[in-house]
Amino acid sequence: MKLQDKIAIVTGAASGMGKAIAEGYATEGAKVVVSDMNLEGAKAVAEAIVAEGGTAFAIDTNVTKAEDLERLFDETVKTYGKLDILVNNAGIMDGMEPVNEISDDRWDMIFAVNTTAVMKSMRIATKLFLEQGHGVIVNNISAGGLHGGRAGAAYTASKHAVVGLTKNTAFMFADKNIRCNGIAPGAVLTNITSSMTSVSEVGVARQGLGMALNPRVGQAEEIAKLAIFLGSEDASFINGQVVTADGGWTTY
């Protein structure tokens, strides 16, 4: 097993890619903390993992609340004694708005979830990792963090920021046995579109030009396999990279 007895937090793990990552990590032997705002969904994932012989517990976490993040890490260490891997997966979509249509409230919320919460989680995790002498961070970002036409301006900017945060963190702690990498999924079958409201007709029309080039929609389990690799010792020499998984969509 690639992650035997590793302790892993996965945020946004009640559904979609987070669920697949949590389940995949458990299958590879990790003890998983299933974190999500949707506690019932998180419990269902944790219970399914335990039913299959794995180890997991669920915790309700609003990643925009500092006290929830502190509790998440405190409960993890209290329960398992340490943290080996942090998977920042929680995220929300914008409404495809170009910059002239963005409201301050939308911008602030997108950044609170997609960027600031990631930074705060990494800040707590790196303190633990420095004390332990090791640790791994896997940020599930987006092809929108590498390109300009995969979402609206707010989502795109929020994900570009996480790319920079990922690379800077990898550099800063490369001599401390701490790795930080990212995943840039293309179109994947998840429920993230449920977070979209007041969708921009202009933005959808422009973004749709690129969708015509997409060879296929990916499955959450395909992203989970990459997250397993990056979290494992198989990726011990990989640091500061953002790996695209999109079936060749962005090669054009």
Model-flagged regions — what are they?
Residues 174, 179, 238-240:
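Short, small/polar-rich loop/turn modules that mediate ligand/substrate recognition or access, typified
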Residues 97-99, 103-108, 208:
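Substrate-binding pocket helix/loop in short-chain dehydrogenase/reductase
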Residues 182, 201-234, 238, 245-247:
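C-terminal helical subdomain
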Residues 122, 158, 166:
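Active-site helix of classical SDR
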Residues 3-33:
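Canonical Rossmann dinucleotide-binding motif of NAD(H)/NADP(H)-dependent dehydrogenases/reductases
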Residues 93-96, 147, 228, 239-252:
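Short C-terminal tail/terminal secondary-structure segment
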Residues 142:
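Residue(s) in the substrate-gating loop at a strand-loop-helix junction
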